[in-house]
């Protein structure tokens, strides 16, 4: 893989990020309802994450967005818990350490924002992602926290920051 950089999202990244997220979801056979596929935020990710305590980061290689992930306060939850959101990578970069670097970037940002815990929800068949989360220190939960609207996600994890 060529060299890459992890950086904050810019307005001109919106279309590539939306296409990347939706292409990965289609590849994985994810339902279009009750998942990130239908999130209105996909239309303008820069605007969505250009707010207090929010950040979205992209992986760029040769002018192309090949991955991304974000941090935001956990929706409909009171407390110092953030959610790792919309972490997706193109197939060509999976398993090459890019996800671990992105995880580190996101968790460092979360700590800087004053969050004490980070929550993730995912789908049971996203095994590669779950391995990364567990290696990063996340632990399984019995049920969801907050109300993200992603009712098809049935795997919930949390990590102390």
Q: How would you name each of these model-derived features?
A:
Residues 20, 116-119, 123-161:
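C-terminal "cap" of GNAT-fold acetyltransferases
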Residues 2-5, 85, 116, 153:
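Short amphipathic alpha-helical segments
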Residues 26-29, 45, 99, 137, ...:
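Residue-level signature of transmembrane alpha-helix interfaces in integral membrane proteins
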């Amino acid at each position: 893989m060529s060299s890459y950089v992890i950086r904050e999202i810019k307005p001109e990244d919106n279309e590539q990020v939306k296409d990347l997220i939706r292409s990965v979801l289609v590849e994985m056979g994810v339902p279009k309802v009750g998942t990130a596929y239908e999130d209105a935020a996909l239309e303008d990710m820069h605007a969505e994450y250009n707010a207090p305590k929010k950040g979205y980061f992209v992986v760029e290689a040769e002018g192309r967005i090949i991955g991304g992930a974000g941090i935001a306060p956990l929706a409909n939850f009171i407390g110092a818990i953030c959610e790792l959101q919309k972490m997706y990578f193109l197939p060509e970069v999976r398993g090459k350490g890019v996800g671990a670097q992105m995880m580190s970037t996101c968790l460092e940002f979360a700590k800087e924002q004053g969050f004490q815990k980070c929550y993730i929800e995912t789908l049971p068949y996203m095994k590669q992602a779950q391995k990364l989360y567990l290696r990063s220190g996340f632990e399984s939960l019995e049920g969801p926290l907050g109300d993200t609207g992603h009712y098809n996600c049935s795997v919930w994890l949390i990590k102390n920051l």
